[in-house]
Swiss-Prot record:
Gene3D superfamilies: 1.20.5.4730. A motif (Nuclear localization signal) lies at residues 65-72. Interacts with the P6 region of unprocessed GAG. Interacts with host VPRBP/DCAF1, leading to change substrate specificity of the CUL4A-DDB1 E3 ligase complex. It is found in: Virion; Host nucleus. It comes from the Viruses. This is Protein Vpx. Belongs to the lentivirus VPX protein family. GO terms for biological process: symbiont-mediated suppression of host innate immune response; viral life cycle. Coiled coil: none annotated. Keywords: Host nucleus, Host-virus interaction, Inhibition of host innate immune response by virus, Viral immunoevasion, Virion. Plays a role in nuclear translocation of the viral pre-integration complex (PIC), thus is required for the virus to infect non-dividing cells. Targets specific host proteins for degradation by the 26S proteasome. Acts by associating with the cellular CUL4A-DDB1 E3 ligase complex through direct interaction with host VPRPB/DCAF-1. This change in the E3 ligase substrate specificity results in the degradation of host SAMHD1. In turn, SAMHD1 depletion allows viral replication in host myeloid cells by preventing SAMHD1-mediated hydrolysis of intracellular dNTPs necessary for reverse transcription. It holds the Pfam family VPR. GO terms for cellular component: host cell nucleus; virion component.
Length: 112
């Protein structure tokens, strides 16, 4: 009987796969941030980013990649809930509680 576990394809090492995963994570965080600013208040995006780093990285001692992953999950959930409630941002603009007047806060560090 053959081993039913999945095998790494020939020519791929675990190191290359991990490096590709980190590149994917960084690309995905940047892409979701570019989309999120079209739907969510910048203040919310910044606060989620900042709190993710404070909690997961600083308080819990998790890695940068894990912290980015948790941030990605939270922003993805926020976008899902926003769209589920009937997104009209791109067609009609934000309603009450969308963008606040005044200059926007800075984007999440390293994701400008």
């Amino acid at each position: 009987m053959s081993d039913p576990r999945e095998r790494i394809p020939p020519g791929n090492s675990g190191e290359e796969t991990i490096g590709e995963a980190f590149e994917w994570l960084n690309r995905t965080v940047e892409e979701i941030n570019r989309e999120a600013v079209n739907h969510l208040p910048r203040e919310l995006i910044f606060q989620v980013w900042q709190r993710s780093w404070e909690y997961w990285h600083d308080e819990q001692g998790m890695s940068q990649s894990y912290t980015k992953y948790r941030y990605l999950c939270l922003i993805q959930k926020a976008l899902f809930m926003h769209c589920k409630k009937g997104c009209r941002c791109l067609g009609e603009g934000h309603g009450a509680g969308g963008w606040r007047p005044g200059p926007p806060p800075p984007p999440p560090p390293g994701l400008a």
